[in-house]
Design a protein with these regions (language model features):
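N-terminal active-site beta-alpha-beta segment that forms phosphate/nucleotide-binding
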Residues: 2-118
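Conserved phosphate- and dinucleotide-binding cores of soluble alpha/beta proteins
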Residues: 85-165
């Protein structure tokens, strides 16, 4: 099996695992993930955070976003662009749309853009992960291209335990 085939199989297994969670499991897991991240020093110290709007059964960080905003942290969300580029955008009050892949995303023209080197913490959705916490994404490479430019940020993959492959 090639690496590409392995990743495709891991991706499929991870998506199936997160979709198989019951509503109760999902609610508990989302709360536990948010609490665990908020207890980390990297979250406590972060001023600028890139997170994501959950899609397709991904771990939902809404509770974390509410608490981070209450603490005065700046929250940016990814906007997928041409050439598989990613932009960190802080949405305005009416600055949301359904963007690429049907994901809720900030409207760039109504958002403040943060440079990658301005980010302190990047929370990345995982489709699957392995025993040594290597991330498998959706396969387009948006984060793979973006993360190396986040030179001062702590980068954390976010997934449910059920997504371990």
């Amino acid at each position: 099996m090639t690496i590409t085939e392995q990743k495709a199989a891991q991706r499929k297994a991870g998506i199936a695992a997160r979709r198989a969670l019951s509503d109760t499991q999902r609610t508990r897991s989302n709360a536990a993930l948010c609490a665990r991240i908020m207890a980390l020093d990297c979250f406590k110290k972060a001023e600028n955070i890139l997170l994501y709007a959950a899609f397709g059964g991904e771990a939902d960080l809404s509770a974390l976003a509410v608490e981070a905003a209450r603490q005065g942290k700046t929250l940016a969300y990814p906007v997928c662009g041409e050439g598989f580029s990613l932009t960190a955008a802080v949405p305005g009050p009416d600055g949301w749309e359904v963007g690429a892949y049907g994901i809720r995303t900030p409207i760039l023209s109504r958002s403040e853009v943060l440079r990658p080197d301005q980010l302190d913490l990047v929370l990345v959705p995982c489709t699957a992960f392995d025993a040594v916490c290597r991330r498998v994404g959706m396969g387009k490479g948006y984060y793979d291209r973006y993360l190396p430019r986040c030179t001062r940020a702590v980068k954390l993959g976010v997934a449910f335990e059920a997504q371990r492959v």
